Design a protein with these regions (language model features):
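Short glycine/threonine-rich loop/turn motifs
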Residues: 96
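Glycine-rich phosphate- or other oxyanion-binding loops that anchor nucleotides, phosphorylated ligands
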Residues: 1-91, 103-110, 114, 119-145
């Protein structure tokens, strides 16, 4: 077996991130260019106590699917990119609002799907064949034991 230990310091491809931000802005999509994601085991919503803890740690997005997938993609010498469709304010962030429901999340997610499709199709048209900023394609070479 081949054992690799790629760095996770910069999890996502800087070149694809730059393209996603540029394309999203061109399409008029609200883009948050950076942020820190905390990944929880799901599928579930976080508790108020967890949400307060995550907020106090400075994490901006709670996600159930951003990891380990991105790390595994890097192990395959591919360029990982995360595009999160924000669906709700977390339970611990906004005063005494009622907790979010699955129904509400699905409604917001479905309303975002058209933007996601437009973004992805436009990005695919513009992904450069030769990448000169990222080193994603060198992960195996640089991290095999």
């Amino acid at each position: 077996p081949i054992v690799t230990h790629p760095s996770a310091a910069e999890t996502y491809c800087p070149e694809l991130r730059k393209l996603a931000v540029k394309t999203g802005k061109e399409l008029g999509i609200t883009i948050h260019e950076q942020g820190t994601v905390v990944v929880i085991n799901g599928p579930r919503f976080s508790t108020k106590a967890e949400s307060k803890f995550f907020t106090n740690q400075g994490w901006e997005v709670i996600n159930m699917t951003a990891f380990p997938e991105a790390y595994l993609v890097k192990e395959m010498d591919m360029c990982p990119l995360n595009i999160s469709l924000i669906t709700d304010y977390d339970a611990g962030l906004v005063g005494d609002v009622p907790p979010v429901s699955h129904h509400e999340v699905i409604q917001v997610f479905n309303s975002n799907v058209a933007n996601l499709k437009n973004l992805l199709f436009k990005m695919i048209e513009n992904i450069p064949a030769d990448r000169n900023i990222c080193t994603c394609g060198d992960t195996k070479k640089c991290s095999q034991l």
